Regions:
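Short linear regulatory motifs enriched in tryptophan with gly/pro/ser
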Residues: 1-148
């Protein structure tokens, strides 16, 4: 088992620490998050691999919604152990794309426990999603074009 911490990005503290089998897939972790935070199971969600600064990397969606012919990595075919395996391992979990609930998911430690369970709980989910500001750094200047 591994212990992970799930933290809602909000003014209020909403934290869950959970023991989970790392051989399960991210879809299973998604279901554990939904259950422990009492979220609606019918909303879309994605995990994002991050670097040490929590900059978003590769998206791992719940379902493949792309029109690409090649196989897209989804939660179902990504083991938890491939993305959460050390103290440097962190994910961002976006739930409900209309309201953009954002959670930080981080590896805490390996555990000898044999039962999956919530080991620590702080706070409850607010009724409305936190109003987050997403900032994007521009790498290049954008030229403006005028209609002729």
């Amino acid at each position: 088992m591994i212990k992970i911490r799930i933290t809602l990005e909000s003014k209020e503290d909403v934290i869950r620490e959970i023991l989970v089998n790392p051989e399960n897939n991210l879809e299973y972790l998604h279901q554990i998050i939904i259950k422990n935070l009492k979220l609606d199971e019918f909303e879309m969600a994605s995990f994002y691999i991050t670097d040490s600064n929590l900059d978003l990397g590769e998206e791992i969606p719940l379902f493949d919604t792309s029109e690409k012919e090649e196989e897209v990595i989804t939660m179902k075919n990504m083991p938890i152990s491939s993305v959460l395996y050390s103290e440097d391992s962190k994910l961002i979990y976006i739930y409900d794309f209309m309201n953009m609930w954002r959670f930080f998911v981080e590896y805490l430690e390996s555990s000898e426990e044999t039962t999956e369970k919530c080991t620590h709980k702080v706070g409850e989910i607010p009724e409305e999603a936190p109003n987050l500001k997403f900032e994007v750094e521009c790498q290049e200047d954008v030229e403006s074009y005028e209609d002729t």
